[in-house]
Regions:
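Glycine-centered loop/turn motifs
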Residues: 15-17, 53, 122, 172
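Conserved class I S-adenosyl-L-methionine
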Residues: 19-32
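Conserved SAM-binding loop and adjacent beta-strand
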Residues: 29-50
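Conserved SAM/SAH cofactor-binding pocket of Class I
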Residues: 47-129, 134-140
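Short, surface-exposed connector motifs at secondary-structure boundaries
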Residues: 75-78, 167-172
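Mobile active-site "lid"/loop adjacent to the S-adenosyl-L-methionine
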Residues: 131-160, 164-170
Length: 172
């Protein structure tokens, strides 16, 4: 199954769908069995202020919703999403390609706990994250790994996110 936009094909794997983001024709590939963005990601993209020429990093980008939205809502120079789950990162890359944002948005597969080794120190002006809300062993854990990773501190903690952000943010 695939959609078509400006001569580009959206490659959709079984179970995936193409959702209209209601912003300048942007669409996002999602798989409800893995993870779909919520209103919190949209609110975050409305809240973040990125100035012209600034570089932004989204830690734990999932399907890439935040850097994709920010690329249209702000005047930032470049947006990068870091995602540990290869399937989610690949889905995000396909959304970036489908929307023609390859020059503005990169999706990198990697571990948040190693972000300062993946990227140059003090390289980013803004860092966003929509972190897991629940501590690892608290609350009902979703049996789907992708959803559990997004909602619980399974692969990283808030401390990991803050530590790596301090290393990657420019001093201002």
């Amino acid at each position: 199954m695939s959609g078509q936009k400006k001569g580009k094909e959206a490659v959709l794997f079984p179970g995936e769908r193409l959702d209209d983001l209601q912003l300048n024709g942007l669409e996002l590939i999602q798989d409800p069995k893995k993870f779909c963005f919520g209103v919190d990601a949209v609110f975050l993209s409305d809240f973040v202020k990125i100035k012209a020429g600034e570089r932004a990093l989204d830690l734990g980008t999932g399907n890439g919703i935040i850097p994709i939205l920010l690329s249209e809502k702000t005047q930032g120079r470049h947006f990068t999403g870091l995602e540990i789950q290869p399937e989610m990162a690949e889905m995000a890359r396909r959304s970036v390609d489908y929307n023609g944002l390859e020059d503005k948005v990169d999706i990198v597969t990697g571990d948040i706990k190693e972000a300062a080794e993946i990227f140059k120190p003090a390289f980013f002006d803004v860092i966003t994250t929509n972190p897991p809300y629940m501590i690892a062993d608290h609350g009902l854990r979703n049996p789907a790994d992708a959803k559990a990773i997004a909602r619980h501190e399974v692969l990283c903690s808030l401390d990991d996110i803050l530590r790596e952000s301090m290393r990657l943010l420019q001093d201002k």
